[in-house]
Amino acid sequence: MNTFKNISLKSFNTFGVEARATELIEIFSLDDLTQILPRLVSEKYMFLGGGSNVLFIKDFDGLVIVNRMKGLCADPINENDIHVTALSGENWHDFVIWTLGMGFYGLENMSLIPGTIGAAPMQNIGAYGVEFKDYCLKVDAIELATGELKSFDHPACQF
């Protein structure tokens, strides 16, 4: 975990807007997230992925949490199917390129969509007739109020 005080957010948003945050924490693991959860009860905060869907119009007087949780794993299910696990801090476009390099096809229409994997289920990203929901089996998430790991299967995601 990295912590910065009174930091510029210019490099953390794709508009390149100069704004400052009182504090910014980069999290790299679920342990990092668990450590800061108690602060979220009483402090103003926002989570930030790739910074492509945010426009700062003024300084942010609070805690900015930047998701840097990375990891990719591919597990064969059978001869024709593969189960891919990707952590939420992975860059979406880099993930699509990785799947293609592994010989897993289907996501290529969604290449060059900015942001991180963590935003994909929230927005059901899509392009050229292909949507995230077409390939998502489940989403694992942390309930911020309790720190409990929750798993949402495809129907529970309500795409």
Give, region by region, the residue ranges found by the protein language model:
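C-terminal substrate-binding/cap subdomain adjacent to the FAD-binding core in PCMH-type
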Residues: 137-159
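Anion-binding (especially nucleotide phosphate/pyrophosphate-binding) glycine-rich loop
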Residues: 1-131, 135, 139, 143-145
